[in-house]
Curated annotation (Swiss-Prot):
Assembly notes: F-type ATPases have 2 components, F(1) - the catalytic core - and F(0) - the membrane proton channel. F(1) has five subunits: alpha(3), beta(3), gamma(1), delta(1), epsilon(1). F(0) has three main subunits: a(1), b(2) and c(10-14). The alpha and beta chains form an alternating ring which encloses part of the gamma chain. F(1) is attached to F(0) by a central stalk formed by the gamma and epsilon chains, while a peripheral stalk is formed by the delta and b chains.
Gene this protein is translated from: atpF
Entry GO terms, CC: plasma membrane; proton-transporting ATP synthase complex
Primary location group: membrane
This protein's record includes keyword Aminoacyl-tRNA synthetase: no
Assigned protein family: Belongs to the ATPase B chain family.
Organism: Salinispora arenicola (strain CNS-205)
Entry membrane topology: Single-pass membrane protein
The protein's name: ATP synthase subunit b
Transmembrane segments: 23-43
InterPro entries: ATP_synth_B-like_membr_sf, ATP_synth_b/b'su_bac/chlpt, ATP_synth_F0_bsu_bac, ATP_synthase_B_chain
């Protein structure tokens, strides 16, 4: 039976080589597939790929621009901060100088007031001393005259004599105390 089937088909077909009709159909199908891919699919893929490349490159450029702008703003902020710090230091130094000037003015005024109070106190002390000395002279004179009257036994009622005697006596005491 095997022989019959083999003898019935006079063409022998090699299992390694395909039939030429299959090669033609395969080539036509491959050409049609290549045409469809080249005409429709590959351009669409190229557009999508180019859009992604543009988006990535644009994103990188935007990121670089944003980074450059951020660096520029950072430098501006640093410059402003440095300027603000120097202004604050200047203001602080000016305030210290003003405070020292005010302090010196207050001290000078306090010294003047202290000197004025001391001078007024000295004047008051001198005036009170003079008043006390005058009162004591009068009282000492009266006591001395009374004592002298009792010792001498006569009345020293004459006011002018009494005042002259008392003044001479007190002047003698002062000159003796001054030595």
């Amino acid at each position: 039976m095997f022989f019959l089937a083999a003898e019935g088909g006079e063409t022998s077909h090699s299992p390694i080589l395909p039939v030429w009709q299959e090669i033609v159909v395969g080539l036509v199908a491959f050409g049609l597939l290549a045409f469809v891919l080249m005409k429709f699919v590959f351009p669409r893929m190229e557009q999508t790929f180019q859009a992604r490349v543009d988006a990535i490159e644009g994103g990188i450029k935007r990121a670089e621009a944003a980074q450059a702008e951020a660096n520029q703003l950072l430098e501006q902020y640093r410059a402003q901060l440095s300027e603000a710090r120097s202004d604050a230091a200047k203001i602080r130094d000016d305030a210290r100088a003003d405070a020292e000037g005010i302090r010196q003015d207050i001290l000078a005024k306090a010294r003047e007031e202290s000197d004025r109070i001391i001078a007024a106190g000295k004047e008051q002390l001198v005036a009170e001393r003079a008043t006390i000395v005058r009162e004591l002279r009068t009282e000492v004179g009266t006591l001395a005259v009374d004592l002298a009257s009792k010792i001498v036994g006569e009345s020293l009622a004459d006011e002018a004599r009494r005042a002259g005697t008392v003044d001479r006596f007190l002047d003698g005491l002062e000159s003796a105390g001054a030595r």
